[in-house]
């Protein structure tokens, strides 16, 4: 079976053609999702091209209406939040590390350039053009960042773009190449905050979307999630953001709004110098990325690269220290639907993937995780096998574990026999008792963190495992997360963000589960 998508790019029109008859079983299973995401990507690109230009789209009276169709995940309105941008490219992670690490000593040149930048931006200018000219002079002469004001093929005109030229294979003759420009940094600026009719952050978001939706970049969009940095400023204030293009646009601020005004404090200039050095490093990182992409074998095919929709972390070391490569196959989130926009939820749920040798895995991004507690339960078959842990940046870990076949969360599970809930709760009790004997508190003991699966010994019998060891801590020492959801989730009295974790609260949560799933069972599992 074949299906064809007509596409166009800088060179003559070509087609993306899939021969689904030659796919493996695993590839054939993913093919419907691949088709939907391919269509969603180009549908969004068409919508962006048909939308007003950035200066009109970002207007307060225009953006709310257009946002209903575009669904940019730029935190405005607050319901439109995507997964963290640092999941998707090393350049963003490097920027955050460099810009926030106070142990990094900026160079004397960067420090002096930051003083010049503050002196220039603290002045009062008669209009936006005058301020932008002063800003670009300092960025060019002092920091080596060149910006050009160009009109895009869809008639948009951002305030400034730091471009990089790469070589790409001709889609009709792969032995030949052509030159294309990609956006490394997109800048949008306003003369002052007061009186501005649009937010430079929103306008930069719109300019990014317009640049990467150009029809001539269709081939690049098929291979890359198009990472770029955004420089947003209003008067003597600026911030740096990151942006990617999945099946919609995701934008995250990577700094706070930083004042560009002279002070008597050295630390202020040090901070600005550190941020600007990090921006230059990100510029070089992204330029290197696009150079490598243009020369890669994947650019020689007409197929869309499905990995463009997922994070760039695709390797880990297993328990024996062996490097393992993997790829992503799906989202483990019901709300992450490619038709309704892949990431239109505040999702921190894991991904599903497959290693190079065919093992199905779960890939979880998290800020904290108790690997020791997970391994403790896994040894007794009370948690999925932990395959690897990778710290990709400060405060961000990637947890890789086995994918549990034929499993459902307890919340989703529909038993064929009533006593199957009893088997489930017996295993939950065993897991919590094991953790408690070793001084741990599980913390987030809810039906969504319990997987139910068939027992291999008996087809009608089921068993349960715990997942999500993010909260697990030591009894009386560690605390419940201050970010815990106390609005839509009812917790037993005593469980509060920032308060010490205690075993007795796990017992309370166990009792609640018992009442919900086995109220008919007279001899309570949890009575001492």
Locate the predicted segments by residue:
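A short, conserved, highly charged catalytic patch centered on acidic carboxylates
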Residues: 90-222
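C-lobe/activation-segment region of protein kinase-like
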Residues: 458-528
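Nucleic-acid nuclease catalytic cores
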Residues: 197-201, 209-253, 394, 523-526
